[in-house]
Amino acid sequence: VISFARGVPAPECLAVEELADCARAALERNGRTILSYGPGGGYGPLREWLGERHGVEPGRIVITSGSLQGFVFLAQQLVRPGTRVLVEAPTYDRPLTILTRLGAEVVTVPMDEDGLVPDELPEGEFAFLYTIPTFQNPSGRTLSLERRRRLAELARERRLLVLEDDPYGLVRYEGEPLPSVFELAEGEQIAYCSSFSKTVAPGLRVGWFVLPAQLAAQIEALAVSTYISPPYLSQATVLELVQRGSFEPNLERVTGLLRERRDAMLEALELQMPEDASWTRPEGGYFVWLDLPSGPPAADLLAQAEAAGVTFVRGTDFFPGGRGGERSARLAFSFVSPGEIAEGVSRLGSLARAAAPASL
């Protein structure tokens, strides 16, 4: 099966030998500490490094077992049944599942080609706004600089907490980097999270949050009550990679491998899709969003595609209650080879063209 379903790095992106060496070095240097329990907010030296990177005190950094675990903690702290939470439409499906499980009322904010539309934020009280401004999951879109400034302004004016999720920001193939909303707002009303899953390795399970001091303490307490302390060995391994100067060269290598896949995906879509199809052209990240106005419903297309040996994620999965994306698909290009991408999109294209009206 050719899978466009999961946003995970290809096996060749993983620096196995160097990470093994980093883990060995970390154990030799500080093994008795990193093999024991410790503070629930994470490995102190890595918190210090992240604090310097973001210009905050280390106590405002909480390192979690992947950033999604941190999202669970944040939602548990802020959400009760009936609590209103804002999300982009479409948005990452796993936070939708978490919020629904907690009984939140999920309210959507529309997007266009420039990302979330800040001036469409509805009035009222909300626990927070969840946004992925850079190379968004699932759409691949990036929030423009003007809109980032506007979002920071609105967050300040309305005292709205914004959770900026930024796991893909460093995985850029072209174009100039944009400042984060957190940077533009100088941290006011913005909580920031990211992860080493897309830049180093997902199996390390190292994500982090930059939070207001009081909220950071509350989230750390939740972490302690949940798993006592996060795994320090993986955090120390990441820190060793950073401190020996290997993070940036590895990121450049990973970005090059993923750029080839992004290019292969865009080329294949251009060749294979019916004339009325449209798709995003991300400058980074892992995903392309495909719209097929004349195609079958995404659930039907997925069933046909799986029978043809291809899988993807239905657009409906990224909208609360499945209300949207009925003829859309998220295609992840990060895991499969360029050759597999060409073949998989060819199979999808055949199915899409077969469903399109003859005039197309």
Enumerate the predicted regions with their spans.
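N-terminal "arm"/small-domain region of PLP-dependent enzymes with the aminotransferase-like
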Residues: V1-G40, E52, L160, E306-T311, ...
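Short, conserved charged micro-motifs
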Residues: P296-L301, G339-E343
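Active-site PLP attachment segment
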Residues: F182-Q218, P230-L233
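Structural signature of PLP-dependent enzymes
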Residues: I219-T226, V242-L266, G295-P297
